[in-house]
A protein has these predicted regions:
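The feature captures the beta-strand-to-loop junction immediately N-terminal to the Walker
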Residues: 33-35
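Helix-to-loop junction immediately C-terminal to a conserved catalytic motif
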Residues: 48
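Conserved ABC transporter NBD signature motif
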Residues: 56-72
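Conserved ABC ATPase "signature" region
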Residues: 94, 104-119
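Hydrophobic anchor residue at the start of the ABC signature
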Residues: 136
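Catalytic Walker B motif of ABC-type/P-loop ATPase nucleotide-binding domains
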Residues: 147-151
Length: 219
């Protein structure tokens, strides 16, 4: 069994997250499934280092994100995404690279997110799905081996959602540890493992294959 890259132990955040524990290995996609208000986004914000837990522990690459934020940094994609008027796709990535001082090249970030052919396209002309892929490219620039994504396919049509998941699976195959949140059981089935959240508690965790067996649409 691979050593975990993400470790969550007995995590609490007031009433939003309650005694949650799970691990994610390198090359694994882990889905947090739950309805609105179940604690998914709050948990992701803790993993991204944006909210300090009131109890328990988090380790990213073995490091406490609140002791060494840079060493434990994770790339993050939030549901609302970013707005970059007046810039092309390549210019957005270049600007982000300079801000984060990350050595990942612009061309590699675009290639990983499958945006190379759109490098010179203005941000305003991108579809919603393409904007989501751009957000993913920026998350890779920030820290490319651990990614957390808040409902990355929300609002996308079927083709765009498939493209996002195709990129995520390719990244996982390259060793990236991925955590996604979703309210859709069929979406969750695309992950390797699923944790079901209810009122801040992780009520079950299982292999996605078991869910796929009873939800054929996600196969």
């Amino acid at each position: 069994m691979k050593a975990p890259v993400i470790e969550v132990r007995d995590l609490d955040l007031n009433e939003a997250v309650r005694n949650v524990s799970f691990t994610v290995a390198r090359g694994e996609v882990y889905a947090l499934l739950g309805r609105y208000g179940s604690g998914k986004t709050a948990l992701l914000e803790i993993l991204a280092g944006l909210r300090r837990p009131t109890g328990g522990a988090v380790r990213i690459r073995g490091v406490d994100p609140y002791a060494d934020r840079n060493a434990a940094r994770a790339g993050a994609v939030w549901r609302d995404g970013g707005l970059f008027p007046g810039l092309t796709v390549a210019e957005v990535v270049d600007t982000w690279r300079r801000w984060t001082l990350d050595p990942l090249t612009r061309d590699r970030a675009l290639r990983l997110a499958r945006l190379t052919r759109l490098a010179d396209v203005p941000f305003e002309r991108l579809t919603i799905g393409q904007r989501r892929l751009l957000d993913l490219a920026l998350a890779l620039v920030g820290r490319s081996d651990v990614l957390v994504l808040d409902e990355p396919t929300a609002g996308l049509d079927t083709a765009a959602a498939r493209e996002v998941w195709s990129v995520l699976r390719a990244l996982a195959a390259d060793g990236v540890a991925v955590v996604v949140t979703t309210r859709d059981p069929d979406e969750a089935c695309r992950a390797d493992r699923v944790g079901v959240l209810d009122e801040g508690r992780l009520v079950t965790g299982r292999d996605a294959a078991r869910l796929r067996a009873v939800r054929p649409r996600a196969a």
